[in-house]
């Protein structure tokens, strides 16, 4: 079979930068799915993307589908011929439909009878006749929330389309994509490059770079920007702050990246660096530069989309653009400093948190009380926790945060320090929102933990309390993130906190605001469900999670200890046998009517195997008790694993459901005792 390389390019107007990668990846995934469905073999496929184009390149694509034999089964032989052996109308109609005579049909014998069959050879279709339709279907399935029309066309896409190119090797594939006829012309850079005729699919990247002045390979462009930005920062003795999200966005904004260095007035460094960084990165898409000590330098790196004969002019232009934004930050900072955070408390009464749950002033009052309650249980400074909780949302009323919203918490920390608040209070102002996203760190300072937990629990209990729990994918109050945050803060800091107690206190502080009588139970169930999701994301086996969930431990740190213990137990040689034995014990005990017997009478231990098991349990129990008390579940399960031989022998030699009622009840008591030891940790009968 012959193969050729395929190139498909869609030339558009500027595509949304934050959607560019997803569009390109989806285009490729959709198209390769089409190739697979069409039984077209290929070696590999990659996507390219730049601000004004999407492209895919498929290497060693078969130029035609492989021929194949298709079995076309006809009527059963018993109904294909009459009593005289002549073909029936059914047989003749089937044969005629397949272009053969009945005599040309073969016979297929199965265990259900004998059938007429025709093995038809189906010739593969040429790839070039399939490409346009497959590419169009791939484009139709792209994730485009708001498609648009342009000109007089009824075609819809995320942005207007101007060119379409489909080449299989050197051959132009005829057809249309989004109403645009396939042609060889490829557009270059808007200002620097020239358009050209693409002669062969293999020459796309090279010609586009040389003639068009466009680096179409997204990953190459991204790597070039990162490397050049790092070099530029190093030249001025600093390190560029290159977050991947910003790097992705900048990569999606330029076709021909040129990295340049600019500066701003040093006086702006008197403003907290977070505010300056926010405007440089968020508004201007610049890379800030820091020195070795982590201090912001009066410089920034930016990426132009053109090679200028006068780069100094481009640098001056960017410096001119950023200066007013930095001046705004300076003005807001100096204005905000004139008022303490405490003085802003009354203004929180003007901001509604939620109609039924009150204002932000109501919320910080609850947070303050709950944070102090949590601090008392964890050994943190309750006075600082209460103070931090009370001030926690006051920075939302500052000019800086109103203008640069992502600086909430961070600016609160800076203003708290200027107000003379304790460092614990100031730090809690910033860390109250952690973790902000998946993979973010959690607060570790004791007061910060108390405030962060109080804020999240107040929201969880409040929203559930008014009957607005998340439904489906909708989660307007980010309750799933809040729940994971609660669990992570407690687990990762090993805090001795019980969810039931925390929920009850939060509910108490809401007073009569809550209308849902089942709120506390629903919040607990919601948090327990987050346990499963979180541990699954961490790679913990589902059966391990279910084994622990069966015991419903409501102390997250304790839950985590059990998860780790059961995961370790799974690695022991005896685990599978003991899990199976526990499952057998569970099934036996489940069939017992009435109360389970608990007292073991040593005089009724008739068989050697049951005597040995009882003796082993009696030997282990004094050792297990302190381990359970100290939540040393891993060591407890390791000790219990030594029961394997005794348990195996018991089930080999002993009939549990003996005719003698006393013997039976004694053996049930022995098994109940055995199972209870494991249940101190988890229900290991659920392990697979």
From Swiss-Prot:
GO BP field: arginyl-tRNA aminoacylation; glycyl-tRNA aminoacylation
GO molecular function: arginine-tRNA ligase activity; ATP binding; glycine-tRNA ligase activity
Top-rank taxon: Bacteria
Gene3D superfamilies in alphabetical order: Isoleucyl-tRNA Synthetase, Domain 1
Keywords, ordered alphabetically: Aminoacyl-tRNA synthetase, ATP-binding, Cytoplasm, Ligase, Nucleotide-binding, Protein biosynthesis
Keyword ATP-binding: yes
Reactions listed under catalytic activity: tRNA(Gly) + glycine + ATP = glycyl-tRNA(Gly) + AMP + diphosphate
CC terms in the record's Gene Ontology section: cytosol
Pfam families per record: DALR_1 (PF05746), tRNA_synt_2f (PF02092)
EC category: ligase
Enzyme Commission number(s): 6.1.1.14
Compartment(s) of residence: Cytoplasm
Subcellular location, principal: cytoplasm
Similarity annotation: Belongs to the class-II aminoacyl-tRNA synthetase family.
Stored PANTHER family: GLYCINE--TRNA LIGASE, CHLOROPLASTIC_MITOCHONDRIAL 2 (PTHR30075:SF2), GLYCYL-TRNA SYNTHETASE (PTHR30075)
Subunit structure: Tetramer of two alpha and two beta subunits.
This protein's name: Glycine--tRNA ligase beta subunit
Organism: Shewanella sp. (strain MR-4)
Organismal lineage: Bacteria, Pseudomonadati, Pseudomonadota, Gammaproteobacteria, Alteromonadales
Gene name per UniProt: glyS
